[in-house]
């Protein structure tokens, strides 16, 4: 009610001073804060009928068209990026992000902001480089203001985003460095003060290790000492170990870790979140992924694939978040193991959905031009001797592979055999 009241109170002020860029920014932000994180029904690709997204968009697009100085207004640029990121057309804010990146060079959050759009448009190199630049700016601010303040969450956010971009690029070194720096920004003291906010960031490392098939390193991961504090981390480490042991052919150890995961999951409170999603909801995806790979690797391939399909369903129904709470798209594992059993037809559908080629997924759920899904789709198209799509996909794949620092042989390193190199 307070957000509605403020928006209503600002409207006549905006109408009287409709050429004042600062007041326009305040009014637009008030409109957007009526339904934060719910500006759009992104599953349907339409504005939230209970919100004011269309009014905010009309005002902002008009002001950028009518007032050249609007392109130098950090607040207006910032608002437009947030407005469009859940929309069906995030690319409309690309130019706004490009300008904002350099406009306030000493504000790390604003240096980072463009990557909310970059990631949705498949520009993962910008996602990585701009967030690393923002992190450097953050370090300067930390020297000035100290580490224990509200801005700590923004420092973490930038490094989390850098990790996410590196994973999509296939840049193992950058992903490992980002997740290491991320952990350093979340000391035990901070987690103890705000466990429901900060603890889930500590659990990022297992995702990176799985993305790059670091099975031996995963089996050597230690469970957190304080399992009551690090409840999400404890569960995710067991998940990662179950997946790792399954891929190493150690099926008894994998099943044991799967049981330990179930016990750990039971202790995760409903209050624990990763931004807009409950930890328990995110860990449900981990459970299906884990059961899928454990079953598949032990020879129960049909059962395993069904679990992975369920993981995809859960992944698709997470609340919007940037970056997404589940950093390795579930379709990458499903597609890889479908190819392993020779189901090229379903795998092609899986990869096209992930890349956004067929438009079946909501726009914010698509991962355009990512090297992993491009590799899988290229294999599918080559297998059926496609002559139309294959050259285009091959061109995109060559560009994406040129930026990875590892050889990409499959969309997920859980794939144990490949007829394709």
Task: Report residues per predicted region.
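Structural signature of alpha-solenoid helical repeat junctions
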Residues: 2, 19-22, 26, 52, ...
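Residue at a conserved register position within TPR or TPR-like alpha-solenoid repeats
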Residues: 31, 83-84, 118, 166, ...
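"A position-specific structural signal for the A-helix of alpha-solenoid helical repeats
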Residues: 26, 79, 113, 120, ...
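Solenoid-like repeat scaffolds
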Residues: 14-16, 64-69, 98-106, 136-137, ...
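TPR/TPR-like (Sel1-like) alpha-helical repeat modules
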Residues: 119, 128-139, 166-184, 255-266, ...
